[in-house]
Amino acid sequence: MVASKYAKRDLMQSEFTERANGLATHGVGLSVDVYSPDLLHLVHSLREAGLQPGYLEVFKATTSAMQWVRRHLPDMKLPYHGEGLWVTQPDFPRGSSGTQGVAEACAQILALRSAWLNHECAMKQMVGYSFGTYLPPLYTELSARMTAENLAFLQEQVDEQARRHGTDPALVLLEMPPLTYFGCGSLAIPAFFRAVTDRVACGLVLDIGHLWTVYRYTGAWLRQTLEAFAAEFLDAFPMERVIEIHVAGLAEFTAQGGAQYMVDAEALPYWIDAHGAPIQ
């Protein structure tokens, strides 16, 4: 059993390496929305300022919108940021997320000619409830196994779409989510992602802002410096799978009453995901 576990891990790493080696270098890019800000206006403004991003990671829209983007940006690398593909949930392959959602994602990947499909390791909906923000997975061994199985299913669907159309398949990437309201489970976050990557040949996205939320909201800031926390976390995280690093996207949240929400006068600010913030 132990030998089988390590053989599986080595096989997944080998498959990932083969897929990753087929990706073109993308350089430094932006994660963008088609509509807000207007994507073509943004690109024009950047070019006027003498800035040329290596790529634009486009958030889910409609397939026709993605086709429009590709027509207007024929030479730009356009990887895809999916939404609504709740791979952390046990019913993913059978529910609308894994059927209609995956079909839409595959069509949009095809329209953009994306090198990868990035998705948060999180969900916003459960048994009919919508939370309006990302909730992290259960950080347990069972949850890691189920997430890996769902990622393998998703990659199979992406591969099948590529075969039908004679294109290169996009690589599925799993993004480390923010710590929002709470986190549950017995596994440390790096150990969870290690358990996932031992079982599936996916890539990872490391979001530095999301890493900061873990430091802030687990209370690690009370025990460690940020530098010590980050070094320990990244040493355990499967960095060999990281394809993309996100380095922006947080804004300080100011609650009414201010100091009453702080643990003490030295508490760090409340930072949250702020995808609507202006690009500066």
Could you tell me what each predicted segment is?
Residues 26-32, 54-58, 76-82, 115-119, ...:
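Hydrophobic faces of well-ordered beta-strands that scaffold small-molecule active sites
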Residues 34-36, 60-64, 84-86, 121-125, ...:
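Active-site-proximal loop/turn and secondary-structure-junction residues that shape catalytic pockets
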Residues 4-7, 15-16, 97-204, 213:
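Active-site acidic/histidine proton-transfer and metal-coordination neighborhood
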Residues 43-50, 63-80, 100-115, 155-167, ...:
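Acidic (Asp/Glu)-rich catalytic clusters
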Residues 2-107:
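N-terminal pre-domain/capping segments
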Residues 40, 90, 127-129, 184, ...:
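Short acidic, gly/pro-rich beta-turn/loop elements at beta-sheet edges
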Residues 42-45, 70, 182-199, 215-227:
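Distinct, well-ordered alpha-helical segments
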